[in-house]
Design a protein with these regions (language model features):
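C-terminal trimerization/auto-chaperone modules of long, extracellular attachment fibers and adhesins
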Residues: 4, 10, 18-170
Length: 170
């Protein structure tokens, strides 16, 4: 009987512990992690490693994620492997829905955007950059040339140092 009571008590303790919020600097946390009136720092010493470890989580889901091994930040929702280790560029940033920033120091924001070129930026809906130092903004725009810019609706800047603006221009 004592063993049964002990097991029930331990079970209730674990159940209660899992349901509580954590507070740093507060005795009354309002969320799972609550740090009131303060800054938060996530850091790692030195430069990124030559062989980065796995991401904190992979696959589909909603998340906000700092991946220290690649100094990369992600926030939003993905439905597949967009934010898995091989689709995250060193020093990159991606936010929104179905975004991928796989290029070195690249940025992808919006819905279904992909920035695969080194230091490239893709913003909007269905935009893509594959050229180095390229920019795609708007709806379904593509900047594939080096240092190219595509802006507007369904524009493509495929030549190096090219610019395409407006609607359905190349």
């Amino acid at each position: 009987m004592k063993n049964l009571l002990f097991i029930i008590a331990i079970f209730l303790l674990v159940l209660n512990a899992q349901a509580q919020n954590v507070g740093i600097g507060t005795t009354n946390p309002l969320a799972r992690l609550h740090v009131p009136d303060s800054s938060i720092l996530f850091s790692a010493a030195g430069d990124i490693p030559a062989s980065p470890g796995n991401t904190p989580i992979s696959g589909a889901g909603r998340r906000m994620m700092w991946y220290a091994d690649k100094a990369a930040f992600r926030a939003g929702y993905v439905n597949g492997n967009q934010w898995d280790i091989y689709n995250i560029g060193n020093y990159s940033f991606a936010s929104g829905v179905y975004t991928t920033a796989s290029g070195y120091s690249s940025t992808a924001m919006g819905y279904g955007t992909t920035a695969s070129g080194s230091t490239s930026t893709a913003m909007g809906y269905g935009t893509a950059t594959s050229g180095s130092v390229s920019t795609a903004m708007g709806y379904s725009t593509t900047a594939s040339g080096t240092i190219s810019t595509a802006m507007g609706y369904s524009t493509t800047a495929s030549g190096n140092y090219s610019t395409a603006m407006g609607s359905s221009t190349t």
